[in-house]
């Protein structure tokens, strides 16, 4: 029995490694569409739970941890862009405005599930079209919710952060440190 991270996110992997956990990664392949028109928190938890349960079905003796991150902009759920053109539109829409980054974590083990989430508000600077274009050409924007990686964007796009920085990275670290998930993983 061990820990499996059901994620392909290098950022989640690094945070878990930095916390001292030994685990293996398995990338789940699930449908992330929002067919049920869920609100942003319910949606991110459903996707996180789906990833964990999908992997757990094949590794029932393991503790499977998964996560998901989305952007909530005035009730609109924004995930990963499918093209640089879509990434441009997303960043342009967020320019000079505040949005919420919501990350969820789910742990599946012994036919049980635990989920947590956190929300961080991020305000973008007023961005010119050329700054957005240069950002998209300089960084990989297609595998990040909202078309940006906080580690690349902080000095370019971001005006203000209110909440947990690591939540923007994709791991609600403050909530995790106080959660039953951490207690369970620490006792394996």
What are these regions (language model features)?
Residues 20-35, 113-115, 119:
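Short glycine-rich, Thr/Ser-proximal phosphate-binding strand/loop in the N-terminal lobe
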Residues 3, 17, 39-188:
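Anionic-ligand binding patches
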């Amino acid at each position: 029995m061990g820990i499996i991270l059901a994620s392909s996110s290098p950022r989640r992997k690094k945070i878990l490694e930095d916390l001292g956990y030994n685990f293996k990664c398995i990338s789940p392949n699930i449908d992330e569409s929002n067919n049920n028109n869920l609100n942003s928190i319910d949606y991110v938890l459903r996707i996180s739970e789906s990833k964990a349960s999908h992997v757990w079905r094949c590794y029932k003796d393991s503790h499977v941890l998964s996560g998901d991150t989305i952007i909530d902009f005035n009730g609109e759920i924004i995930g990963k862009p499918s093209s640089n053109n879509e990434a441009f539109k997303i960043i342009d829409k967020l320019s000079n405005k505040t949005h919420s980054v919501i990350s969820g974590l789910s742990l599946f083990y012994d036919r049980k599930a635990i989920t947590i989430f956190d929300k961080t508000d991020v305000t973008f600077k007023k961005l010119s079209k050329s700054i957005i274009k240069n950002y998209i050409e300089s960084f990989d924007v297609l595998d990040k919710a909202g078309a940006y990686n906080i580690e690349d964007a902080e000095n370019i796009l971001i005006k203000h952060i209110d909440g947990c920085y690591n939540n923007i990275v994709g791991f609600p670290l403050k909530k995790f440190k106080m959660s039953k998930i951490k207690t369970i993983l620490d006792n394996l």
